[in-house]
Amino acid sequence: MSVTAKIIPQEIIRLKRDGKILDEQAINGFVSGLVDGNFSDSQVGAMAMAIFQQGMSIDERVNFTKAMMRSGEVLSWEGFDGPIVDKHSTGGVGDKVSFMLAAIVAACGGYVPMISGRGLGHTGGTADKLESIAGFNVQPSISEFKRIVKDVGVAIISQTDNLAPADKRLYSIRDVTATVESIPLITASILSKKLAAGLDVLVMDVKVGNGAMMNNLDDAKALAQSITSVANGAGVKTQAIITDMNQVLGTSAGNAIEMYETVKYLTGKQREPRLHKIVQALASAMLINTNLASSEKDAREKIDKVLNSGLAAEKFDRMVSALGGPKNFIEKPWDSMKKANVITEVRALQHGYIAQTDTRAIGMSVVGLGGGRTAPTQQVDHSVGFDRILPLGVQVNRGEVIARLHAKDEDSANRAIEQFNNAITYSEESPELPPVIY
């Protein structure tokens, strides 16, 4: 039953709390209240929890997404001679895919206007990672953003006040009210920003596992279905790929150290196999859906060409300098990023195979080090985190190095070492590894 409500915050909250289907007027009232302040922070938190507990129908999700999209500016890309394409990840630990992926697709002829988020819960934020680079401005004007996309082919920025401002407020409150993992809220949050960005094509990386918002495959499939249904229904060609997040992606988790792994990937110095497989799959989907590649084989050849020729690395370097960073970031990344005060090793507590990692716990350990937020206004320490993390399935001896820790002081380092060790489970037999792509 559809219920029409006056725009009184507590009445709209009550309707959803009681499991009613909100009509367009009620949804528009909530979204307007996000922007004009008619809903207080506590009321927004209560509404988020009501949606978390009661869910939303597909019609509600479509109306919610469109209302949040219309809460600000909607970008137009007239005069561009190639497809406008983006990728979005539901988030995980060590997920630096956006950086190499955007550079690869831009090098292949796509235009990638990527509007990224901050850290959310235990997951790292793309915008936070870019701010590891001295001078990098993640909040240029919209006109400057469009100019860089046209000139370079790619620009990665943080959410602006102009695009889906309703979501910007909701996103920050979800982070501190335990309402991150709601499929309707995730769907509307992602797609309001992506639809406002004026995309032709969107590729979704839906993470599944103990380091993802979606812990099990059924939930991941439900989210993928929700996003593709709402997005394709709104006129944006969208494909979702479900990828594993039962361990840290790549070999690092943090901010500056993930940017360094990105540089090593783009320059060919280090391409961790799972990370490379996911980058290839997502890049192929972006190229095929935009008709920049005619087949999977054609896409893979184009990806290899721009990586091996250095063109993708050049695109990333140009984007960094265009957005205020140094002109030679790829060549000398640590000249413009802060290193941690304490760098030490995490050693295995026993002999055996690394059978499981509590990936969420590792993400929360990075947050505890200062590399993420426990409150929306908190400052991030870009220097902290873990790198040289060994993957699942590796056999180690007691005392062998399984990761390296970057911390601001000895006390936080000791806590993080204990947390990392507690997150590792060993086995005597070689474990069965989860698939990289489902």
Swiss-Prot record:
EC number(s) on file: 2.4.2.4
Cited Gene3D superfamilies: Nucleoside phosphorylase/phosphoribosyltransferase catalytic domain, Pyrimidine nucleoside phosphorylase-like, C-terminal domain, Transferase, Pyrimidine Nucleoside Phosphorylase, Chain C
PROSITE patterns: THYMID_PHOSPHORYLASE
Catalytic reaction annotation: thymidine + phosphate = 2-deoxy-alpha-D-ribose 1-phosphate + thymine
Biological or metabolic pathway of the protein: Pyrimidine metabolism; dTMP biosynthesis via salvage pathway; dTMP from thymine: step 1/2
InterPro entries: Glycosyl_Trfase_fam3 (IPR000312), Glycosyl_Trfase_fam3_N_dom (IPR017459), Glycosyl_Trfase_fam3_N_dom_sf (IPR036320), Nuc_phospho_transferase (IPR035902), PYNP-like_C_sf (IPR036566), PYNP_C (IPR013102), Pyrmidine_PPas_bac/euk (IPR018090), Pyrmidine_PPase_CS (IPR017872)
Coiled coil (residue ranges): none
Keywords: Glycosyltransferase, Transferase
GO aspect biological process, one term: thymidine metabolic process
Pfam families tied to this protein: Glycos_trans_3N, Glycos_transf_3, PYNP_C
Recorded GO CC terms: cytosol
Keyword Glycosyltransferase part of the UniProt annotation: yes
Molecular function via GO: 1,4-alpha-oligoglucan phosphorylase activity; thymidine phosphorylase activity
PANTHER family reported in the protein's UniProt record: THYMIDINE PHOSPHORYLASE
HAMAP family reported for this sequence: Thymid_phosp (MF_01628)
Similarity field: Belongs to the thymidine/pyrimidine-nucleoside phosphorylase family.
Quaternary structure, from the entry: Homodimer.
Function: The enzymes which catalyze the reversible phosphorolysis of pyrimidine nucleosides are involved in the degradation of these compounds and in their utilization as carbon and energy sources, or in the rescue of pyrimidine bases for nucleotide synthesis.
Official protein name in the record: Thymidine phosphorylase
Organism taxonomic ancestry: Bacteria, Pseudomonadati, Pseudomonadota, Gammaproteobacteria, Alteromonadales
Name of the gene this protein is made from: deoA
